[in-house]
C-alpha cells in the first residue's frame, strides 16, 4: 500500500510517501518568514502553505519514484492546528483523493505525534505491543497520555498554562535568543552548568485533567517564565552575556526534570512498561538523555522518534493513517472532512476522556 501523507498544521509544509510501512520520502519545508516576528503569524503560514503545497507534494512523489496514479491512499492533518494552515493541506488532500478516486484519511496531528516514535520501529503497520505512556511535547502542546494497545487512550496530564516548548521560546526571548529558542538553548546548555541557578520546578499538587488516574500528571511552566524574568532583571547585561550558557542550562534543567519526573511517575503509577516521547521538544538532547536514563533505572522500555520525525512532518501522518486503516479504525472515502482546532474535537473514539 502506498500512502501520501500531507502536513500543514503550523509552519511546516510537508509531504511524505510510505510504501508498505516504509518511508520512501519525507519532504519538509520550514517557513523562515516568521523569524522576525518572534513567533508564527497564522495568515503568513497559510499563504506559504498555499504557495508551497503543490511543489512539496510533487517532490515527495518524485523522491519516492512514483506518480500520483500509483497512490492507494491519501492522508492529511485535519487538526488541531492553525485553522487556515490546516485547511490548505486538508482541502488539497481531499481534492486530490477525490480526483484519483482513492480513499482519504483525516489524521489527528497530536495522535500522529504520539505514534511517531514508532515510525522506524513498526514496518508493515504493526501496532506497538502493549500499553505505553506518551509524552507529546511541543511549542503548542504538553500532553501525557496512557495509550492502550487497541489505539484508545486517556489524556492523564496536560499543561495548565504554557506548553514546554513555549516556555523554552519565551525564556529564550528574554535572553535575546532567536526564534525558535528551544534548539538554541539546547546548544548553549551543552557548555553550561545546570546547577548555576535553581529555577522553580512546578510539581502541581492536584490533577485537573484525570481525576481517575493515580497520581498527578499535570504540568505548569508559567511560574518558571516569571522566575527567569525576575532573575534577569536583577542582573547586568554583562553578567547575562558571560553566563548565558549557564542560564540556558539551568532553564533547560528546570523544564526537562519536570517532564521526566511526571512521565516516569505516570508509568509507574499505571504499571506501564513503556514510554515514548514525541513532538518538537523531544528533539532536545537533555530530554532524550534524561528520559532514557530514568527509564533504564526503572526497567521501562524507551521509544523516541528519529530527529527528522520529532518536529512536524508528513511521515507521521502517513504512518498513523496506515496503522488506522490496517486495524479498520477510520471511515474511508470521505471527502468532506472539516478541520478542527482542538485536540479533544478530533479524537477518534467517543469513549476517550
UniProtKB/Swiss-Prot annotation:
Cofactor: Fe(2+)
GO molecular function: iron ion binding; N(6)-L-threonylcarbamoyladenine synthase activity
Disulfide bonds: none
InterPro entries named in the record: ATPase_NBD, Gcp-like_dom, KAE1/TsaD, TsaD
Any single biological process term in GO: tRNA threonylcarbamoyladenosine modification
Catalytic reaction annotation: L-threonylcarbamoyladenylate + adenosine(37) in tRNA = N(6)-L-threonylcarbamoyladenosine(37) in tRNA + AMP + H(+)
Matches recorded under Gene3D superfamilies: 3.30.420.40
Principal subcellular localisation of the protein: cytoplasm
Subcellular location: Cytoplasm
Residues bound to substrate: 136-140, 169, 182, 186, 284
Origin: domain of life: Bacteria
Keyword rRNA processing: no
EC number(s) recorded for this UniProt protein: 2.3.1.234
Matches recorded under SUPFAM superfamilies: Actin-like ATPase domain (SSF53067)
Residues reported in the UniProt entry to bind Fe cation: 109, 113, 312
Sorted UniProt keywords: Acyltransferase, Cytoplasm, Iron, Metal-binding, Transferase, tRNA processing
Cofactor note: Binds 1 Fe(2+) ion per subunit.
GO cellular component: cytoplasm
Pfam family membership, one: TsaD
Family from the record: Belongs to the KAE1 / TsaD family.
NCBIfam families named in the record: gcp_kae1 (TIGR00329), T6A_TsaD_YgjD (TIGR03723)
PANTHER family reported for this sequence: TRNA N6-ADENOSINE THREONYLCARBAMOYLTRANSFERASE (PTHR11735), TRNA N6-ADENOSINE THREONYLCARBAMOYLTRANSFERASE, MITOCHONDRIAL (PTHR11735:SF6)
Biological role stated in the UniProt entry: Required for the formation of a threonylcarbamoyl group on adenosine at position 37 (t(6)A37) in tRNAs that read codons beginning with adenine. Is involved in the transfer of the threonylcarbamoyl moiety of threonylcarbamoyl-AMP (TC-AMP) to the N6 group of A37, together with TsaE and TsaB. TsaD likely plays a direct catalytic role in this reaction.
Protein's name in the database: tRNA N6-adenosine threonylcarbamoyltransferase
